[in-house]
């Protein structure tokens, strides 16, 4: 057992009120220091999924809803995406427009595609009020499909999804740090809602709680600024704080609706935004998307690859790219790393030669 200092007074030279380099106050907490199993596992991540508008018809046949990207989604030991629709037939719309819901067959489509769990930390899960959230969780339970990031109270919303792969325990924490449609959408002790941390300390606490019992901790967060291809200063500050708290992987989605840079931030791996995966309208920035595949060994990401894809203007599905189109997309993705301030290699690694071109996947740089 080790002491991890994240608020005042933990034997720091600064004494009371000392803080980390990011300004996060120190708080003494006890975490399990036992080494993660020296056994490689693979984790897969992709972005936002909406079964609305042009993508609603995809659920007519759930087995084909994710098209040719199914192999990339099903290959990793664990795959997670972001569901942006309430699964409900009831409730009352809360917005004048832009209320999104889908039938329960969405869970069948996700399962058929090889997705293992989804974050529902989007405020769209409350587009039809608390009833929409209750129905979403009930439908997921009936389907036997894991959802996380929202619930009947704050404890349920911040509770990580925990799974095991090859004997390695993985905890995935969902957060939403974007401005919510209504303040009441944030889960509280006596109110249903999404995992919307009031401050950085609450986000850090969620990571620490997960770290107590998991070999690998992933934070899957909605954040950022609309249509931005570079992460905001707020994203960078939060990523650093989460990494300092013990997050091994930090994956973003949500507001950007486009790819942002990915790479190592110290020993943690950060993908600031994976954009849209199955989407109801065209992006004004770029249709680029894809599936991120990470190899984790001993609790640290040792390798990363990316299957580039493009959201179809006809169906809204992400279609994997091949040949020259894939090479060009990978080059664009790698270029986004510069403004993200991330490294193309894990700490201590020797610079590697440029990867050989891949028809549908390869290292993002």
What residues fall within each predicted segment?
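N-terminal export and membrane-targeting signals
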Residues: 1-2
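Acidic, metal/ion-coordinating pockets
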Residues: 11-365
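C-terminal motif of bacterial Sec signal peptides marking the signal peptidase cleavage site
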Residues: 6-9
